[in-house]
Design a protein with these regions (language model features):
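Residue-level signal for the membrane-embedded core of alpha-helical transmembrane segments
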Residues: 34, 88, 92, 147-150, ...
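Interfacial aromatic "cap" segments that immediately flank transmembrane helices
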Residues: 13-43, 113-139, 151-202
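Alpha-helical transmembrane segments of multi-pass membrane proteins
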Residues: 41-55
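Membrane-embedded or membrane-proximal helical elements that form or frame transporter/channel pores
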Residues: 64-89
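Hydrophobic alpha-helical transmembrane segments of multi-pass membrane proteins
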Residues: 81-88, 142-146, 159, 220-229
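Juxtamembrane transition segments at transmembrane-helix termini in multipass membrane proteins
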Residues: 1-10, 21, 57-70, 93, ...
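Hydrophobic alpha-helical segments and helix pairs
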Residues: 84-123, 127
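Residue-level signature of transmembrane alpha-helical entry/exit and packing/kink sites
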Residues: 29, 33, 75, 79, ...
């Protein structure tokens, strides 16, 4: 396996280069990335099947008051279970993938369990940081929409920073924003592509009634594949973070 560190330190990579290098990393350590995807994905697949959450219909939500009424009157226990589990396991997944990507750019291979063990050690700061992030984004989306979307882009490195730079809370959020600002539209394009791809994949995957064997099989297969794609996209974001961090710090040293 080649070392990618020098490429990441040299300059800001193009989007295609980030996708290509990320795929190489994904392929070289596929088994362990697959394990992380399944360890973090299977519990959500099962709870969603056994405790179907209430689905938000955007067409029925015209005002903030409509959202509050929907939340009070229609949200079921499945919504709370799946929301919390998805949030928690997504943090574990991002932290674990960040650890694996960092060692792999230095030509080292580690296991999924090694990465998850390291993630558990920083999970509390990451949860606190994620909670602060959600509050900021929620108010941005609730009252202004566009600023909320801007915050999502600016803070996209937050969990990577918690994992790899031992920084959390507001400091991690500020750190992420400082790295993203010079490449905001690049980050926006990447996030937009990821969201678009995942939604198109879900819509286009074959389906059947949920109460049939075929329906359960299609649901399970689509979610497994979706979590694999999601793992690949998280590798891209982790690599993007490392690239921006290396280049930014190098520029600061040159300036000094």
């Amino acid at each position: 396996m080649p070392s990618f560190r020098k490429e990441l330190e040299k300059k800001d990579l193009e989007i295609l280069d980030l996708f290509t290098i990320s795929f190489s990393i994904f392929r070289y350590n596929f088994f362990n990335f697959f394990l992380i995807a399944m360890i973090c994905g299977i519990p959500i697949i099962l709870t969603t099947a056994y405790f179907p959450p209430t689905i938000l219909d955007p067409l029925k939500i015209q005002t903030f008051e409509d959202f509050i009424n929907w939340f009070k009157n229609e949200v079921n226990e499945g919504f709370y279970i799946n929301t919390f589990l998805s949030w928690f396991l997504d943090i574990i997944s991002i932290l674990s993938i960040s650890f694996l990507v960092e060692v792999m750019i230095n030509k080292k291979i580690r296991t999924a369990f090694w990465a998850i063990k390291k993630s558990v050690k920083v999970i509390l700061p990451a949860i606190i940081t994620s909670f602060i992030y959600m509050i900021i984004v929620f108010f941005g989306l609730a009252f202004f929409i566009i600023p909320g979307l801007i915050f999502v882009v600016l803070f996209m490195f937050t969990n990577n920073i918690c994992a790899l730079r031992h920084t959390w809370g507001i400091d991690a959020i500020k750190y992420s924003a400082s790295l993203i600002k010079p490449k905001f539209f690049k980050a926006l394009f990447m996030l937009s592509f990821i969201v678009f791809f995942e939604n198109v994949f879900i819509i286009s995957f074959p389906s059947a009634p949920a109460d049939t064997r075929e329906g359960l099989l299609y649901y399970f297969l689509s979610r497994v594949l979706l979590y694999l794609f999601d793992t690949y996209f998280k590798i891209i974001i982790a690599l993007f973070f490392l690239n921006r961090d290396f280049v930014s710090n190098s520029q600061k040293l040159d300036f000094d």
